């Protein structure tokens, strides 16, 4: 599907009707969604109850990016790109788990939960570990809900959350727990 076909598809969309099938299955439309929505806006990725303990983590994959959401020993939540700074390998290969350090399976570079480089084998003596931390992903927690933003210059979170703030606060989600999760594989995108 090209942009001209997409414009035609949008023009023929009827108000108050469900979207045409292409909006759910087209790779081109999904790529545009990632570029224009998910790469620029705050995105809800999960609830803090999903990572209750020190070292608990889960991955959130968005487009071609994989983000590690992990809790440290002070209960702070960090979001890092799941990419080793050495050779670009993915660090966490499991979708969720617990780890007190993040170890790249390729050359065993080791990172602290805060993203700082803890160890890198066989590097020159003038190698500065402080220059090789994991890339952080913008993140905020509001009422127990974890949000990330992939943009280098994210829009203001307070402005983003303002229209729904009172509704979210009313439900006391900071104290909520996930009772059960179920995965349903589908041949479609996020819509």
PLM features: residue spans?
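Residues immediately within or flanking Cys/His clusters that coordinate Zn2+
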Residues: 57, 78-81, 101
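Residue-level signal for short segments within beta-strands and strand-turn junctions
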Residues: 71, 81-83
């Amino acid at each position: 599907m090209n942009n001209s076909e997409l414009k035609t598809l949008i023009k023929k969309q009827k108000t108050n009707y469900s979207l045409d099938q292409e909006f759910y299955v087209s790779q081109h439309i999904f790529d545009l969604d990632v570029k224009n929505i998910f790469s620029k806006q705050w995105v809800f990725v999960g609830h803090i109850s999903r990572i209750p303990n020190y070292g608990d983590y889960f991955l959130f994959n968005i487009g071609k990016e994989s983000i590690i959401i992990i809790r440290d020993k002070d209960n702070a939540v960090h979001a890092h790109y799941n990419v080793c700074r050495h050779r670009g390998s993915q660090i966490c290969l499991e979708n969720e788990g617990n780890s007190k350090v993040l170890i790249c399976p390729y050359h065993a570079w080791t990172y602290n939960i805060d993203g700082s480089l803890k160890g890198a084998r066989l590097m020159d003596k003038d190698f500065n570990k402080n220059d090789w931390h994991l890339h952080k992903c913008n993140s905020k927690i509001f009422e127990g809900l974890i949000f990330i933003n992939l943009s280098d210059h994210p829009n203001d979170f307070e402005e983003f959350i303002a229209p729904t703030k009172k509704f979210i606060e009313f439900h006391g989600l900071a104290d909520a727990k996930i009772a059960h999760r179920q995965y349903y594989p589908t041949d479609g995108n996020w819509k």
